[in-house]
């Protein structure tokens, strides 16, 4: 389905109040994951946010996903000779769009792609999309998924695999060379070991949204926007203490965090085995789990 153009022009001043007020930590060199054609890198910002960058192996165009803040993103791109050509937004929360006005001041020709249904809350759009749309960025097909639950008009971006993928269920570091699974930029709908709070949606909506993710190839890399994995899995282990997959993953995650490493990306297959929300049989079961997670103090 073709992308529908937005009905408004940019007005950077309209979002100036949305800029994140939390001080940005020093820029850390983020790890890159990908192959020869397109890579994904993550930039840690704020307390636990990740900004994602879709780019090639050298200087050239880049796409940024959910920029909470701008300064570390600008620095990261400029240090690598990358030119911002597009910004993808999954939803309207300020820790996902707060950096957009400043990024546009630096790269005024960059496109802003977001849900057309959220035009009032994400007013800088130059391309408005909806679930079922498909477009191309940096030579990759991008499928738009409507995934309400966390917010009314939350969307996700699924990029199908562009090369041979690794064996389903395989663990360990991502392989080097021309091997690339699909990518899922899911915002705050799916987290590693968890899911987003239901601020505007219902358990029925969230369950249906997670079912869309569960249907993706198991090797699909999951790029969720917050580092919540250790807490999510500690809660899951308290709910299912005899589940060996959850316990094993929790131990590995704690080791990774102690060493200063991110736990993102995850993979759909790993989430199917260890994420209680993705395993929920129906909306009622998900609602019980969400209530338990909300109340859990660790």
Features from the language model and the residues they span:
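Intrinsically disordered, low-complexity proline-rich regions
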Residues: 1-18, 158, 173-175, 186
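Zn-dependent metallo-beta-lactamase
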Residues: 4, 8-82, 102, 107, ...
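Accessory terminal helices/loops
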Residues: 19-27, 167, 211-221, 228-298
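Active-site HxH/HxHxD metal-binding segment of metal-dependent hydrolases
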Residues: 47, 62, 69-146, 160-172, ...
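Divalent metal-coordination and catalytic microenvironments
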Residues: 54, 66, 91, 103, ...
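Short beta-strand-to-turn element immediately C-terminal to the catalytic PLP-Schiff-base lysine
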Residues: 54-55, 158-160, 236-237
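Active-site metal-binding loops of divalent metal-dependent hydrolases
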Residues: 67-69, 92, 117-118, 150-151, ...
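Active-site-adjacent loop/tail segments of enzyme domains
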Residues: 194-220
């Amino acid at each position: 389905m073709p992308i529908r153009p937005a009905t408004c022009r940019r007005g950077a001043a309209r979002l100036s109040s949305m800029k994140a007020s939390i001080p940005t930590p020093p820029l850390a060199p983020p790890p890159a994951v990908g192959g020869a054609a397109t890579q994904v890198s993550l930039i840690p910002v704020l307390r636990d946010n990740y900004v994602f960058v879709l780019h090639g192996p050298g200087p050239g165009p880049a796409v940024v996903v959910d920029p909470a803040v701008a300064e570390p993103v600008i620095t990261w791109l400029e240090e690598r000779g990358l030119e911002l050509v597009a910004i993808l937004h999954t939803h309207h929360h300020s820790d996902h769009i707060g950096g957009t006005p400043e990024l546009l001041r630096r790269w005024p020709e960059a496109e802003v792609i977001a849900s057309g249904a959220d035009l009032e809350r994400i007013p800088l759009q130059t391309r408005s999309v909806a679930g079922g749309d498909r477009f191309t960025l940096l030579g990759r097909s991008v499928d738009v998924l409507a995934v309400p639950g966390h917010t009314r008009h939350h969307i996700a971006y699924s990029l199908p695999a562009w090369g041979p993928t690794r064996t389903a269920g395989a663990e360990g570091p991502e392989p080097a060379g021309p091997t690339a699974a699909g990518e899922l930029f899911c915002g705050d709908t799916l987290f590693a070991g968890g899911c987003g709070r239901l601020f505007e949606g219902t358990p029925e909506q969230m369950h249906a949204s997670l079912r869309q993710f569960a249907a993706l190839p198991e090797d699909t890399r999951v790029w969720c926007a917050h580092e919540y994995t250790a807490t999510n899995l500690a809660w899951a282990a308290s709910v299912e203490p005899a589940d060996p997959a959850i316990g094993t993953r929790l131990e590995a995650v704690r080791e990774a965090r102690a060493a200063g490493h991110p736990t993102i990306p995850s993979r759909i297959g790993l989430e199917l085995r260890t994420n209680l929300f993705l395993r929920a049989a129906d909306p009622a079961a998900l609602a019980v789990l969400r209530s338990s997670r909300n109340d859990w103090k660790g």
